[in-house]
């Protein structure tokens, strides 16, 4: 016991001695720390705040220089911290083009986001195909609006497996089942467009919103069939722009009441609730032996068949999806299609109306494939015969690609080129527009020339430049749907309506709102037309 006490006394004495030595002969580090504390004590709060701000500003510039490396971009951040935030609130197409022309790789920095833009075809393809290094990136608030459990946020094998379960929904055979109901929607909106023009005394009026509505109606009918009502379609079509506004590249990362993100979240929840109810009706329809007439039906049929299948892959890829899962997936289909298809519709009607020779060729082809029999209903074989109509659609997609850029986030340091490695956490954006306007592949790329897509032509053989729908593991699921739907839509409108576009100084100017639109919002008039004689009725 006494030995333990002696040890304690000795230990305490030793520590006391060390403490005294530290006081008598302080180390350099301790001296420096005390010096800094004394300095801070003598400073006012204002001076401390100003010093911290200066340190932050210097670090912001230093971090930018380190990440920028040798690629094109502003030498310094002209606006500290925020970068070109104010300019991004009103994006201009001309500024995008200037950025793409500045170099194969260029950069900007907005707040905490360092953004690298790739403007060449090969760099764009490399990024789109490098799922090991990158994954699709949406704005921070998208996770809250689309929901964290949504399949679009899956990565790697989980994403691949989920996607395989969806592939069967957008094959030509599946899409053929949706055509009869789509034709009914087209007929209804042709009558509506003619009526709107008549009520306006055939004076030019903006059709931007009507184009968004018809494309939303076509998409929702493809996805949900007759399970969704006309009122529900109209409500979603009217409010969907709130989702687009909420998911703009620059926005609040949190949801605050009565802001864009708040309204966007409300709209998304409303739409997904409708889709949940539709999913249950589709399950009931298939369980009762009904045939698929929409995407939900086809999905439920795959699940139903998988239950009785001996194929392991079928059971894995077509497990029993809940109504909530189906509703979230269908909302992402709408999210992926609505703005892009609305953009294509606006440009397609403007471009064709402004080129009477193109419109005449479309009408001639439409009569030929129907053998002048106007009772012929839309079907897959009919649409596949519309060679020129499809060339017009493809050239519109090249000439005015709805999607200019696709944002990705870097998962780990990514050697994008021999001279530059994109840092982890950076936003990496492959640009699609330059590849589609490459003069080495597309002669006179800024001219609209449908004939460039004749089979065997230089353009049709340049598969690597055709990036309208992306490439790699996240290539667009709905590209076949787009071509089929728009060939049917343009063919019917060309035959049964006489549509005219009023050209303004802003018609060929590009407005960027998620996708691209004519700046004057598309001034059109529609009149009823006899498809055989060409007679126009008022």
Curated annotation (Swiss-Prot):
GO terms for cellular component: endoplasmic reticulum; endoplasmic reticulum membrane. Pfam families: p450. Pathway: Steroid metabolism; ergosterol biosynthesis; ergosterol from zymosterol: step 4/5. InterPro entries: Cyt_P450, Cyt_P450_CS, Cyt_P450_E_grp-IV, Cyt_P450_sf. There is a cross-link at residues 164, 198 (Glycyl lysine isopeptide (Lys-Gly) (interchain with G-Cter in ubiquitin)). The keyword Iron applies. It comes from Saccharomyces cerevisiae (strain ATCC 204508 / S288c). It is found in: Endoplasmic reticulum membrane. Its EC number is 1.14.19.41. Its cofactor is heme. Heme binds at residue 476. This is C-22 sterol desaturase ERG5. The chain crosses the membrane at residues 46-66. Present with 24700 molecules/cell in log phase SD medium. It catalyses: 5-dehydroepisterol + NADPH + O2 + H(+) = ergosta-5,7,22,24(28)-tetraen-3beta-ol + NADP(+) + 2 H2O. Disruption phenotype: Abolishes the production of ergosterol.
């Amino acid at each position: 016991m006494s030995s333990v006490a002696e040890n304690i006394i000795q230990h305490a004495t030793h520590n006391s001695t060390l403490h005294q030595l530290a006081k008598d002969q302080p180390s350099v580090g301790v001296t420096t720390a005390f010096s800094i504390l004394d300095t801070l004590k003598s400073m006012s709060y204002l001076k401390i705040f100003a010093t911290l701000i200066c340190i932050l500003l210097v670090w912001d510039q230093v971090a930018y220089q380190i990440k920028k490396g040798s690629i094109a971009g502003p030498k310094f951040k002209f606006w500290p911290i925020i970068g070109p935030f104010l300019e991004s609130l009103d994006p201009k197409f001309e500024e995008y083009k200037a950025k793409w022309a500045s170099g194969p790789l260029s950069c900007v920095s907005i707040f905490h986001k360092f953004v690298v833009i790739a403007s060449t075809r090969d760099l764009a393809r490399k990024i789109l195909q490098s799922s090991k290094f990158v994954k699709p990136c949406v704005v921070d608030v998208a996770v809250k609006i689309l929901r964290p459990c949504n399949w679009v946020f899956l990565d790697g094998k989980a994403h691949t497996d989920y996607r395989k379960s969806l592939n069967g929904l957008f094959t030509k055979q599946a899409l053929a089942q949706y055509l009869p109901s789509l034709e009914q929607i087209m007929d209804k909106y042709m009558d509506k467009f003619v009526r709107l023009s008549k009520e306006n005394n055939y004076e030019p009026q903006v059709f931007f919103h009507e184009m968004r509505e018809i494309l939303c109606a076509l998409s929702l009918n493809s996805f949900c069939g007759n399970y969704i009502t006309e009122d529900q379609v109209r409500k979603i079509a009217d409010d969907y722009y709130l989702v687009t506004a909420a998911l703009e590249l620059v926005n609040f990362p949190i949801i605050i009441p009565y802001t864009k993100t708040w309204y966007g979240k409300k709209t998304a929840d409303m739409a997904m609730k409708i889709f949940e109810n539709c999913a249950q009706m589709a399950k009931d329809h298939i369980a009762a032996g009904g045939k698929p007439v929409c995407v939900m039906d086809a999905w439920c049929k795959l699940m139903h068949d998988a239950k009785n299948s001996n194929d392991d892959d079928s059971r894995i890829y077509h497990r029993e999806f809940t109504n909530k899962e189906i509703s979230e997936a269908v909302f992402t289909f709408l999210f992926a299609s609505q703005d892009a298809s609305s953009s294509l519709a606006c440009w397609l009607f403007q471009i064709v109306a402004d080129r009477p020779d193109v419109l005449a060729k479309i009408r001639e082809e439409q009569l030929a494939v129907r053998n002048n029999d106007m009772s012929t209903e839309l079907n897959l074989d009919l649409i596949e015969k519309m060679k020129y109509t499809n060339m017009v659609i493809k050239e519109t997609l090249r000439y005015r690609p709805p999607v200019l850029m696709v944002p990705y986030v870097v998962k780990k340091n990514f050697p994008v080129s021999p001279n530059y490695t994109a840092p982890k956490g950076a936003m990496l954006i492959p640009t699609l527009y330059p590849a589609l306007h490459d003069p080495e592949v597309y002669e006179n790329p800024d001219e609209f020339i449908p004939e460039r897509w004749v089979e065997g032509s230089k353009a049709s053989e340049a598969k690597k430049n055709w990036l309208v729908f992306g490439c790699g593991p996240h290539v667009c699921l709905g590209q076949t749907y787009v071509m089929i739907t728009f060939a049917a839509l343009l063919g019917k409108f060309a035959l049964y309506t006489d549509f005219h576009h009023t050209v303004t100084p802003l018609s060929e100017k590009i407005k960027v709102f998620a996708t691209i639109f004519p700046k004057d919002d598309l001034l059109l008039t529609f009149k009823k037309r006899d498809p055989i004689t060409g007679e126009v009725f008022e």
